[in-house]
Amino acid sequence: MLPLASNAEENSSSEGSDVSRLTAYSDPARIWGSGVERVIEEAYRLCFHTRILGGKVMNLRMPFAQDNERNKLTGEDWGFLGGGKGNPAFLWERINQVLDSDDFRLYTETLSDGKEKVIIFDLPTQTWSVTRDLFEIARMKAGSYRGLLHRPYVLVSGRGLEETDVYNYLYCVGQAGMDCSGFVWHIQSRIAAAGGVDLGRTLARTLGAKHGEDPSWYAGTNFYNAKSSQIIPVKDEICNLRPGDILLFRAEDGRMAHSAVIQSVDFFSGIIRYLQCTDEAPLAERGVHESFIRFDPQNTAVSLSDPSLVWTQNRYRPFPGEKPSPFSDDGKRYRAYPEQGGGRVVRLRAVSQAIGKMK
């Protein structure tokens, strides 16, 4: 029996070595070093979760949590868990409960029966139904979309569950995720914490949070555009940009409608990597995802509004058949509404100070 024990010990040691190697390989510091880029990458990775669903290994991304953009026809509000401002650990706990539910199991079975069908989601009631009507299926294939903002229609093949199907369910039924500013707050909070700063406590009064309230609930995109000593305007020339800076995209009425955060600026290769949470993206990227801007390394005095820059992130309708975004890519969205000021870049003073401490 002694040789068997020895073999078991060797196997255990080998498995431990494999785990150690995988851990070292996946360490963000391997690529991003030990500075703020690594901290942002770690915070970004917290927004992904691996599950086995429908017999497949799936790397799920944190869904987008719309902020009542879809209640225009219903006149009633329904709330995403945490108002779109929850931290990843809190949200993944709820998401796992949803994915372990009997209703999601039935949803998976329905999408795996080998038959084409249309799934009809209803956001106000957090339910779904199915029709196998051939005329309805033909309408969907022909591009005749009958869905509404609060009742998305989705054509499925019946050949099994895909990651996009999981997203649809979590968005419409689970209603757990992050909105754009909630994701930015998550990143900013992690940066601040790495520098020894409690961002919520530091900005609670500025945000208008009352005692005992979660300050993150008040950190909407308009806060990042506020005239406050805690908000540092940044001239949006590439040479001025730093990891942790916040990109703001303006709406037609002059308010800021979307926010994202810069993770890295590679002045050698001419690439800006920024992170965001939105559903106006390719189906497989809806939710939290990375995006890029390409620039000429020899010309870093150029503004982000300059059309010579290449913004690689294309924008799509959240559900096939819905009205498309008026902007085909993030660059056009950033440059939009110049009469209102267009896009802009800011940084949080408390986060900037925390980054200084990290250095």
Regions found by a protein language model. Give the residues of each.
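Hydrophobic h-region of N-terminal signal peptides that target proteins for export
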Residues: L2-A5
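N-terminal capping segments
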Residues: G16-D198, I355
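Intrinsic-disorder/low-complexity loop/linker signature
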Residues: G55, D113-E116, T125-Q126, S229, ...
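Short regulatory "switch" loops immediately downstream of catalytic or recognition motifs
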Residues: S189-A194, S264-F267, P318
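...with weaker cross-activation on analogous glycine-rich loops/strands in unrelated enzymes
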Residues: V197-G287
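Low-complexity, Gly/Ser/Thr/Pro-rich intrinsically disordered linker/tail segments
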Residues: C277-A284, V288-K359
